[in-house]
Amino acid sequence: MGSRLSLDGSVRVVVVGGGFGGTAAASLLKSWAVPFVLVDVRDAFHHNVAALRAAVESGFAKKTFISYSVTFGDSFRQGKVVAIDPGRQQVVLSDGEELHYSHLILATGSDGPFPGKFNQVIDMESAIQTYEDMVKEIEKSQRILVVGGGAAGVEMAAEIKTEYPGKEIILIHSKTALADVELLPSVRQVVKEILLRKGVRLLLSEKVSDIENLRPNQFQKDMVVRTEKGTEVVVDMVVLCTGIKINSSAYAAAFGDKMASDGALKVNKHLQLEGYENIYAIGDCADLKEPKMAYHAGLHANVVVTNIINSLTQKPLKTYEPGSLTFLLSMGRNDGVGQVNGYYVGRLLVTIAKSRDLFVSKSWRTMGQTMPS
């Protein structure tokens, strides 16, 4: 990909959200010289696939935030989308600026608890410092409870135990099997074996009873945490890895009738929003029968940018079919397990492919910048 198209002045793609899908789409549009504006509420892309390690390993966080303006220049707007007017083909920002679009890509992503997701609207340097502060809290804590045993929870427990083998790590999960339900049973079993081998204590089929009263991510010696079954654990710190929520606020008013129950947008096989030929949804905010993953957002971006270009050049549109699942779990920098196109892959391949650098170098390449050492 990447040549110049002869376009008239009416073409302008607005991309709402600068996560994995939005930055991939913007980078592709840039390479094709298609006029675009990327809008995000923050000043930097967050490579949150590596966020858990940034919370554990000092000096790593600076590799996980990448400036938008350095990459996209005048094609980037920092701002919050407060309204979308599909009739006038406009996106309205909180400062009153109105961005006209010929095509709209909604890539608003999802939120979840820190450190897996970063929810504050602060500048890049302050964001990096927030992770460095978390590293210090973990260093002080001898006993750490990780709440939630999906992909984020098992990776978090493994990251801490790899960096600090002497700490007591307890993982609590409301179900009997760990990681995501879409994964092969063999993968989920190996996840459990890796954690046990590392010395993580597992409390399965248990739920924390007073989760809203906990103060997560802070050292607090000898906290007593109770489960609904009456189990008590005494810990110095709690880390929440308890699931995600779709960021729908930018589009809920305009497209409420096109939303699934979780807030994701209903799309057709071309990833077009139902009822619109020039509006697309990608990544976590697209209602697709597949796990919410950075890898999928990148695939969506490819399809959508191709479809925008094909629609401008009178070519047929590409379809997106969720395929057999590819899902790699990094269990610390020296271990991992997963599956590729539905087939099991073991420790060596996953460690080489993901666990060592968690794809951070790939994001710096996508953004055309040099990663800090």
Swiss-Prot record:
GO terms for molecular function: electron-transferring-flavoprotein dehydrogenase activity; flavin adenine dinucleotide binding; oxidoreductase activity, acting on NAD(P)H, quinone or similar compound as acceptor. The record marks 173 as: 4-hydroxy-2-nonenal adduction. Its EC number is 1.6.5.-. A lipid is attached at residue 2 (N-myristoyl glycine). It is found in: Lipid droplet; Cell membrane; Cytoplasm; Mitochondrion membrane. It holds the Pfam family Pyr_redox_2. It comes from the Eukaryota. InterPro entries: FAD/NAD-bd_sf, FAD/NAD-binding_dom. It is a lipid-anchor. 6-hydroxy-FAD binds at residues 17-21, 53, 81, 284. The modification N6-acetyllysine is found at residue 167. Keywords: Acetylation, Apoptosis, Cell membrane, Cytoplasm, FAD, Flavoprotein, Lipid droplet, Lipoprotein, Membrane, Mitochondrion, Myristate, Nucleus, Oxidoreductase, Transmembrane, Transmembrane helix, Ubl conjugation. It catalyses: ubiquinone-10 + NADH + H(+) = ubiquinol-10 + NAD(+); phylloquinone + NADH + H(+) = phylloquinol + NAD(+); menaquinone-4 + NADH + H(+) = menaquinol-4 + NAD(+); menadione + NADH + H(+) = menadiol + NAD(+). The modification by 4-hydroxy-2-nonenal (HNE) adduction in mitochondria results in loss of the oxidoreductase activity and activation of a novel function in mitochondrial oxidative stress signaling. GO terms for cellular component: lipid droplet; mitochondrial membrane; nucleus; plasma membrane. SUPFAM superfamilies: FAD/NAD(P)-binding domain. Its cofactor is 6-hydroxy-FAD. Binds 6-hydroxy-FAD non-covalently. Belongs to the FAD-dependent oxidoreductase family. A NAD(P)H-dependent oxidoreductase that acts as a key inhibitor of ferroptosis. At the plasma membrane, catalyzes reduction of coenzyme Q/ubiquinone-10 to ubiquinol-10, a lipophilic radical-trapping antioxidant that prevents lipid oxidative damage and consequently ferroptosis. Acts in parallel to GPX4 to suppress phospholipid peroxidation and ferroptosis. This anti-ferroptotic function is independent of cellular glutathione levels. This is Ferroptosis suppressor protein 1. It comes from Taeniopygia guttata (Zebra finch). The gene is AIFM2.
